[in-house]
Amino acid sequence: MFRQSIVKQSCRFLATKKQPSIGRYTGKPNPKTGKYTVSFIEGDGVGPEISKSVKAIFSAAKVPIEWESCDVSPIFVNGLTTIPDPAVASINKNLIALKGPLATPIGKGHRSLNLTLRKTFGLFANVRPAKSIEGYKTTYENVNLVLIRENTEGEYSGIEHVVAPGVVQSIKLITQDASERVIRYAFEYARAVDRSKVLVVHKSTIQRLADGLFVDVAKKLSSEYPDIELQTELLDNTVLKTVQHPEAYDDVVVVCPNLYGDILSDLNSGLSAGSLGLTPSANIGHTVSIFEAVHGSAPDIAGQNKANPTALLLSSVMMLNHMGLTEHADKIEKAVLTTIASDAKNRTGDLGGSASTSSFTDAVIERL
C-alpha cells in the first residue's frame, strides 16, 4: 500500500531527473541564441496536427528549442527503402529528433520507415514507460511499468524467404553484441531511475539457443551491477502476472528481445491508460536518440482536428529530460496530465471526451 501511494502521488513518467550513462545527449545550444536545435519529423496522417500542438505548447512554455523540419519520405536505393540524405544529415548533426507517426507505403520492396530509422541511427533500445494518470480512471490503477525492448534484430531482422510453394521461413537473429548493449542499458537505466531489479523476459524453454543467449548475456553482465537484482521470467508468465498484478513490477525494469517487447509494451499501455494515445516512447542510440508517439498515423481522422497529441507531448517530455531540460519537462508534463484529469470536456474523443486537438492544446497552455 505504501508503494502504491507513492506511485499515485508522483506524476512523472520518468522517476528521476538522472539519465543512464549510456546514450547520453551531448548536443550543445547555439551560443548566439542559447537554444538547442531538434530535428522534427512531423509524420503522416494526424502527424502534422499533433506536431502543431507540440510546437504551440513548447512556444508557450518558452522551451529553448529551435525545430528543424525533417522530411523522411522514403526513397529507393538499390531496390530498398531508405531515408533521404538531408534527413540523415539533420539528425546526425542535431543528435536528437522528435517523430510523429509514420505510415509505411504498401508495395514490394518497402520496409517499415520506423525500422529503417532504427537501423540507420543504431537505435538499439526502445524505452516504453506506462503509468496510470491520477484523476483519469481506467480499469487498472497505480500501474507504473517500464519496459526496454531490443530494437534492431530478433524477428524484425527482415530475414525471410520462400522455401517451397506454401512454405515460408523467417529467421530470428539474436547476437551477443546487440543483446549486451540493450541489457547493459537496462541495468544503467535501472540505476538512474532507482529501480532495484532488472527482469529479463524470454522463452528459452523453446528458443533454447536464441533466447538462451539473451539470458546468458544478462547473467554475465549482472556481476557488474551488484546493486541491481537480476531476475528472469518466461514470457507467458510475465503476461499473466502483468494483467493480474501489475504493481508487482513497479520496482522493475523489464528488458526483452524485439518481438516480445513489441507485444508487452502495448499490453502495458492498455493496462495503464487504455490507449496508445497516451503512451510515450524513446529510441536510444549511442550518439543519436529519437523520441516518438507509438500510435499509428490514423488517416481516417487526419485533418479533422480530432487527434490526441498526448503521446507525442509526453514523448517530448522524455526528450527534454534526456536533454537535461528538466524544469521545462516538469512544467509541460504537469500541464498535460492535469488537463487530462480535469474534465471530460478537456479530453479528446479516444479518451471519452469532447475536446478537439486545438482545444486540448489551449487547455494545456492555460495550465502551464
UniProtKB/Swiss-Prot annotation:
Keywords: Magnesium, Manganese, Metal-binding, Mitochondrion, NAD, Oxidoreductase, Transit peptide, Tricarboxylic acid cycle. Residues 1-14 form a transit peptide. The keyword ATP-binding does not apply. Mg(2+) binds at D236, D262, D266. Its EC number is 1.1.1.41. The record marks Y156, K203 as: Critical for catalysis. Its cofactor is Mg(2+); Mn(2+). One of its GO terms (cellular component) is mitochondrion. The keyword Membrane does not apply. Binds 1 Mg(2+) or Mn(2+) ion per subunit. Performs an essential role in the oxidative function of the citric acid cycle. Octamer of two non-identical subunits IDH1 and IDH2. This is Isocitrate dehydrogenase [NAD] subunit 2, mitochondrial.
